[in-house]
């Protein structure tokens, strides 16, 4: 009978960026927002050429239950709603925004204070997560609100924060846990999952 030697193969982890702090990049001249940047139905554009947007402006509505809204991460003017070739080589609809400064929607709280106490019900929190277009950071960008809706009569008994990267070169989750741990651990308490 053939057997394997003890020890196995240990390929390089390629985590060269694990020790590097998160950096803010310079603004581009134009930002392109694909409407299919998550699993499920693509979002539907709600802006048109010439519209002025700010950071935090909703630019696309979720196109179905398994879909996500999209918000602008730049301020500027919508140049066009057209198509772009995605990473897989397919032509997909997208919103093109010419960047003009750094204005934020007035309704966005940019303070460094974290929410310490939440007075919303779990259902209200899930609705806000859906409205905000929150998706997972994995390759599928799965809409988070879908995962937070257990079947009727069921209740979550524990929360597992999966920070295992799906690709060998990725270290974004690792850096977020190191630099933003206080924000990550605020979320379970908001759902009443901290007891």
Predicted region positions:
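Well-ordered alpha-helical segments embedded in enzymatic catalytic cores
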Residues: 183-187
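Well-ordered secondary-structure scaffolds
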Residues: 1-182, 193-195
């Amino acid at each position: 009978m053939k057997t394997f030697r003890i020890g196995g193969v240990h390929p390089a982890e390629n985590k060269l960026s694990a020790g590097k702090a998160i950096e803010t990049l310079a603004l581009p001249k134009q930002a392109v927002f694909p409407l299919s940047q998550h699993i499920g139905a693509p979002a539907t554009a709600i802006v048109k050429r010439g519209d002025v947007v700010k950071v935090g402006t909703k630019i696309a509505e979720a196109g179905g239950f398994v879909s996500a809204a999209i918000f602008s991460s730049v301020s500027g003017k919508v140049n066009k709603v057209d198509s772009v070739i995605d990473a897989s080589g397919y032509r997909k609809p997208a919103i093109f925004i010419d960047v003009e400064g750094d204005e934020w929607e007035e309704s966005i709280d940019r303070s460094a204070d974290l929410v310490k106490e939440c007075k919303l019900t779990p259902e209200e929190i899930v609705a806000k997560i859906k409205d905000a277009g929150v998706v997972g950071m994995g390759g599928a960008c799965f809409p988070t609100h879908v995962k937070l809706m257990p079947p009727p009569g069921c209740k979550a008994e524990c929360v597992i924060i999966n920070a295992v990267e799906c690709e060998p070169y990725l270290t974004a989750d690792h850096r977020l846990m190191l630099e933003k741990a206080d924000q990550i651990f605020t979320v379970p308490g908001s759902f009443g999952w901290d007891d």
